[in-house]
Amino acid sequence: MASEGGSVRHVIVVGAGPGGLSAAINLAGQGFRVTVVEKDAVPGGRMKGLTLGASGEYAVDTGPSILQLPGVLEQIFRRAARRLEDYVKLLPLDVNTRVHFWDGTHLDTTRHLDRMEAELAKFGPRQASALRQWMEDGREKYGIAYQKFICTSADNLGYYAPWRLAPTLRFKPWQTLYRQLDGFFHDDRVTYALAYPSKYLGLHPTTCSSVFSVIPFLELAFGVWHVEGGFRELSRGMMRCARDLGATFRMGTPVEKVRVDAGRAVGVKLVGGEVLDADAVVVNADLAYAARSLIPAEAREGSRLTDAALERAKYSCSTFMAYYGLDTVYADLPHHLIYLSESARRTDRDALEDRHVDLEDPPFYVCNPGVTDPSGAPAGHSTLYVLVPTPNTGRPVDWVKTEQALRERIPAMLEKVGLKGVREHIREERYFTAETWRDDFNVFRGAVFNLSHTWLQLGPLRPKVKNRDIEGLYFVGGGTHPGSGLLTIMESANIAADYLTREAGKGPLPGWPYVPPLEPESPVQARAG
């Protein structure tokens, strides 16, 4: 696949979301000629953010609001001989998340383990000891699980080879996440607080593999981080870095099709007819949308990306989003808040498959960034980002009525997490339903967390980063291995870059696989304390 005469290869990246930006930095840093083609005028994809108010006085994030394991992001910059701190500033949060429960109690999760033990002591005298045991189990699991199951291409069933699996068997990956956590804590409040990220994998703690206990572990071990200026600023910083490395950006330029000739991706055709040639194409867009809309149907025949196969796949829930600009600041509350209602513990089929909207007492998440970073609002003002899980558009939901009901109910719901009197402080507001995600952001079925992470959609059974059927075509993002979430999206970009550097005769991607050590090794991590 190397270009004639050993010249620098040209890679087109479709989409300037976090996966595309990570791929652009990786590839430009290794000497590839990179062109990023993005339909929007600003970078970020779902991470681009939005502004509220006649003069844009409120700025809010629309996608990720949590950065885990910042060392992975640092390493993307470092391997390109750049410093992350020259482009963005990361802020560690003192409290990861305050989780409110159905019984009126709450738990503050934190990377400060002495304080975490004190928090858990409120739930029983044995909980601090249980935490120490669970963290020790996590330390043993983390290095093995991260490298063997996340920092790997998973391109064939060798992913499940006995030599690979043997070191993990003592962690009982066949257990559910609920059973694994309950085996230590024996309290549904603690178990569901630590297991709640499974919702964003398209699963329930009682159906999610215990392998994913690495997610709450790394949040307690490394903390949760915010990007100063919001995650939209991370998009801009990554774009600046890629440009500094020589990448070219074509913004406001939608792609009509990926061009395929004799089974090989040879470039893209832009809306309007312009043709761009390339040696390889990296697509960073919602996988099901991109396959159906950008890849010719005849090139997908017999693959796992046919329209029929994508219709049969299982997808995550969607979300109803409320974005508020407020004329007050809730400075006494943490950055991240979760309410777990009694319905979060439901295990009936309707609940497990996200069939209906819960309008009575839904669980929800709130981002209150002004307490950490006042840059998104005028002095004395702030923003809130409220997320309520809902079915995706594959379910028969009246979205107009759902929006009307939740617009009315959310201000009162917020009192359950200590946000009192929100209704009278709202100055600007915007709402997204599953249909917004589908129609405005090109997310198939509005399933914002992409393909569910069921056993039949994990590892080599999940769509590949390197497409098997079209040479030179790569997918990065939440729909491919290793899965949804900002951290794993960045790892999918690392996987794509590793393939491309090898195939260009440059050898493996430098410094990858990379498993951030449990002890701080960088200025950014060291600042977390």
UniProtKB/Swiss-Prot annotation:
Cross-referenced SUPFAM superfamilies: FAD/NAD(P)-binding domain
Enzyme class of the recorded protein, top EC level: oxidoreductase
InterPro entries cross-referenced by the UniProt entry: Amino_oxidase, Carotenoid/retinoid_OxRdtase, FAD/NAD-bd_sf, Phytoene_DH_bac_CS
GO biological process: carotenoid biosynthetic process
Gene3D superfamilies listed in its UniProt record: FAD/NAD(P)-binding domain
Cofactor: FAD
Inducers of expression: By blue light.
Pathway: Carotenoid biosynthesis; lycopene biosynthesis
Keywords: Carotenoid biosynthesis, FAD, Flavoprotein, NAD, Oxidoreductase
EC number: 1.3.99.26
Catalysis: reaction(s): all-trans-zeta-carotene + 2 A = all-trans-lycopene + 2 AH2
Domain of life: Bacteria
GO molecular-function terms, A-Z: oxidoreductase activity, acting on the CH-CH group of donors
Cited Pfam families: Amino_oxidase (PF01593)
Binding site for FAD: 12-45
Entry annotated with the keyword Oxidoreductase: yes
PANTHER family for this protein: PHYTOENE DESATURASE (PTHR43734:SF1)
Similarity remark: Belongs to the carotenoid/retinoid oxidoreductase family.
Classification via NCBIfam families: crtI_fam
Main function: Dehydrogenates carotenes in the trans conformation: converts all-trans-zeta-carotene into all-trans-lycopene, one of the last dehydrogenation steps of lycopene biosynthesis.
Protein's recorded name: All-trans-zeta-carotene desaturase
Species, as recorded: Myxococcus xanthus
